[in-house]
Amino acid sequence: MSLNPRDIVVVDAVRTAMAKAKHGAFRNVRAENLSAAVMQALFDRNANLVPAEVDDVIWGCVNQTLEQSMNIARNAAIMTGIPRTVPAQTVNRLCGSSMSALHIATANIKAGMGDFYIIGGVEHMEHVPMTHGVDVNPAASKYAAKAAMMMGLTAELLGKMHGVGREEQDAFGVRSHQRAQAANENGYFDNEIVGVEGHDADGFLRLIDRDEVIRQDANLEDMGKLKPVFDPKGGTVTAGTSSALSVGASALAVMSYERAQALGLEPLARVVSTGVAGCDASIMGYGPVPATQKALKSAGLAIDDIQTVELNEAFAAQSIPVLKDLGLRERMDDAVNLHGGAIALGHPLGCSGARICTTLLNVMRQQDTTLGLATMCIGMGQGVATVFERLK
C-alpha cells in the first residue's frame, strides 16, 4: 500500500509479563527498572533505531508517588542507552495514560514537532497501591456521586442499566482466563513479552517471561461460587470478573513513515485515527463507546470495517455493555480479545493503554488482519481509542 511521508507508524511494541500485585514476581523490581527494560528492548530488537534521535520519551503512569514520582519517564530513561540529551515526560489520564502518550506523540509528529518518540507506561500496584496518597476534594461530591470514584460500583451500575446478569459476567470472565492461558501455552505472547529478572514464589531469581495473573484452571463452576466484592447484598461483580491488580510496563517505538524509510525499518502498523471522550463518572466504563465512535468517524470507517479489537476488560459488567452498543458482542469469538484481556492478565493502570496496543498489533499479525481497534475506559468518566492499520 502507499503511505504518506508524514503518516505515523509503529515500528515495534513490547511489554513485560504481567505480574501479581501481591507477592508477585516483580516484588523486588522497581517501576523504573521495568520501564527501562521495555524502553531498552526496543533498541535491542531494532539495531537501526538510534537512541540519540529520539525526540521525546512520553510515559504514562497513574499514581505518581513513591518510586513512581518525580517524572518516572526521565528516571527510567536515564537507566537505558538513551542519552541525557533526550527529554522525557510523564503523563496521566488514569487508565488511559499510556494510550494518551501515543496520542500525544501522534499529534506531535503530525504537527512537525519531531519524528521519533518512545511511548509507553508502567504501574507497580504492589509497591504503590492504587489508593496510596489519594485525597479527593470533599466538595467534588456536590458535582459527582462519591461512589463514582469506586470503580466496582460504577461497573455494578452500568451492568444493571444494561441488564447484564451474573451468569453472563461469569462466562465472560472464564473466557478471558481460558483464552489467555491458551495464548500462554501456545507461545502467542512470546513476540511481545520482554523477559525481566524477578523472583519466583520460592524466592529464586528467574527470568519472568510469562504472565502470572492468569487463573489456569478457570471454570464456570468455581467462578459461580465467588461472592460479590463491591455490593455484597445485591451485586453481581466478583473478583473473578474484575481486572486483577497487577504490575507491568509496555512500550512502543513511534515515528513518521519517512523516518522509518530512512532507517530501513518495516513498520508494524500505521496509526489511522485516535479518539478520546467523556461520559458520566457514575458509568465511567461506558467511555470506550463515544471514544471509539470519534476515532471511527475521524477515519471514515464503520465498526464493521474493524477486524480485530482489544478492549481493556476493567470488568465484565462494564465490557459487555460496551461491546453490545458498539455492535461487537456477536463478533467476540473471531474479533475481540482473542488472547484474553485484563480480567486474566491484570490492569496495571499506567501500562494498560500501551499493553493493549501491543497485544492488538501482535494478534493482527497472527490473524493476518488489516484494521484493528484498541480502546479502554477511564476512571471518573472518560474513554480512549486508537485505530491501527497493519502494514506487515
From Swiss-Prot:
It is found in: Cytoplasm. Keywords: Acyltransferase, Cytoplasm, Fatty acid metabolism, Lipid degradation, Lipid metabolism, Transferase. SUPFAM superfamilies: Thiolase-like. It is an enzyme of class 2 (transferase). The keyword Transferase applies. PROSITE patterns: THIOLASE_1 (PS00098), THIOLASE_2 (PS00737), THIOLASE_3 (PS00099). Its main location: cytoplasm. InterPro entries: FadA, Thiolase, Thiolase-like, Thiolase-like_sf_Thiolase, Thiolase_acyl_enz_int_AS, Thiolase_AS, Thiolase_C, Thiolase_CS. The active site is at 95 (acyl-thioester intermediate), 347 (proton acceptor), 377 (proton acceptor). CDD domains: thiolase (cd00751). GO terms for biological process: fatty acid beta-oxidation; phenylacetate catabolic process. The keyword Acyltransferase applies. One of its GO terms (molecular function) is acetyl-CoA C-acyltransferase activity. Pfam families: Thiolase_C, Thiolase_N. One of its GO terms (cellular component) is cytoplasm. Pathway: Lipid metabolism; fatty acid beta-oxidation. It catalyses: an acyl-CoA + acetyl-CoA = a 3-oxoacyl-CoA + CoA. Heterotetramer of two alpha chains (FadB) and two beta chains (FadA). Catalyzes the final step of fatty acid oxidation in which acetyl-CoA is released and the CoA ester of a fatty acid two carbons shorter is formed. Belongs to the thiolase-like superfamily. Thiolase family. NCBIfam families: AcCoA-C-Actrans (TIGR01930), fadA (TIGR02445), PRK08947.1 (NF006510). This is 3-ketoacyl-CoA thiolase. It comes from Chromohalobacter salexigens (strain ATCC BAA-138 / DSM 3043 / CIP 106854 / NCIMB 13768 / 1H11). The gene is fadA.
